[in-house]
């Protein structure tokens, strides 16, 4: 008993079609993914890119926005804009003004190294450079940068360390 014609043809490869070209064509036609959540929320599928950005009060590019050389005699007048969605700009400005936390940190080895150097030599970076614990032969400026990095990344820990040094010296 034979197989159905459709089931035999289903798994055959069509050599006449360029799959790479078809995939590129599909990717070009599909809608772009918008990273910014404010723009994505306010985007209208039925409008063009230029119309959407104009409604939001955004510029599609920098070309022609600002004059290269302002003329001396003419006054620069502000452009008239019909911003239909001003909340997009406000949300984007609010997000940009929020300061992100600094993710830089110090390794435990570097913290121990800096604490040893400060404990032995206080703020004398030249003496730190000559210290025998300076295995990597850091210059005074490199050591200073490491101490400043430690101060910036762990300010509470550094303050507690300095306070403990002061209490040890006073006793």
Curated annotation (Swiss-Prot):
Region named Disordered: 1-34, 56-79
Name of the protein: Nucleolar protein 16
Q: Where is the composition biased (Basic residues)?
A: 1-31
What biological process terms from GO does the record include? ribosomal large subunit biogenesis
Cross-referenced Pfam families: Nop16
Its localization reads: Nucleus, Nucleolus
Q: Name one GO cellular component term.
A: nucleolus
Q: Which keywords does the record carry?
A: Nucleus
Could you say which protein family the record assigns here? Belongs to the NOP16 family.
């Amino acid at each position: 008993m034979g197989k159905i014609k459709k089931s035999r043809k289903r798994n055959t490869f069509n050599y006449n079609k360029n799959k790479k070209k078809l995939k590129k064509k599909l990717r070009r036609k599909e809608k772009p993914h918008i990273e910014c959540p404010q723009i994505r929320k306010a985007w209208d599928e039925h409008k063009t890119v230029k119309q959407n950005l104009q409604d939001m009060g955004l510029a599609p590019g920098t070309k022609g926005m600002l004059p290269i050389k302002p003329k001396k005699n003419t006054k620069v007048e502000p452009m008239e804009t019909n911003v239909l969605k001003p909340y997009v700009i406000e949300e984007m400005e609010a997000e940009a003004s929020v300061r992100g936390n600094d993710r830089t940190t110090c390794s435990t080895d570097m913290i121990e190294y800096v604490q040893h150097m400060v404990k032995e030599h206080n703020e004398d970076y030249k003496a730190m450079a000559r210290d025998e614990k300076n295995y990597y032969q850091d210059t005074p400026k490199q050591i200073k940068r490491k101490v400043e990095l430690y101060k910036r990344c762990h300010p509470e820990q550094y303050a507690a360390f300095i306070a403990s040094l002061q209490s040890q010296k006073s006793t």
